[in-house]
Amino acid sequence: MGRYYNGDIDGKFMFAVQGSDAGERFGAIEQESGYIDYVVYKEDSYKAIVEELKEIEETGAVDRVNKMFKDDWLYNDEKMKKFGVSSQDMSEYADHRMGKQMKDYFDNNPDESELYFTAEI
């Protein structure tokens, strides 16, 4: 159960914290209804992806969530409170994972000028 995105990058949206439109934060453009088909143009978006990742990292959310997930990936309100992790931190963490995939795709495929993926709504 859950919503997935697939294409040049693949993953699962974090349950209850990440919207299907998370890719738009990193320059993805919706292509079709039903599922959301996205394209990210390297020339237009790579710099923005790097900057957005840096902004997310500067909030400390990624570090806080990584610390919480150090021993296991299970979490609840009590565990989040113990580690000082907010719902917004979880959302930032989830979006960071997607943005990192986009950056890594372009870094690992230097000849590619665009990246495609389909997100479940």
Predicted feature locations:
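Conserved GNAT acetyl-CoA-binding A-motif
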Residues: 115
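Acidic (Asp/Glu-rich) sequence patches and key acidic residues
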Residues: 1-112, 120-121
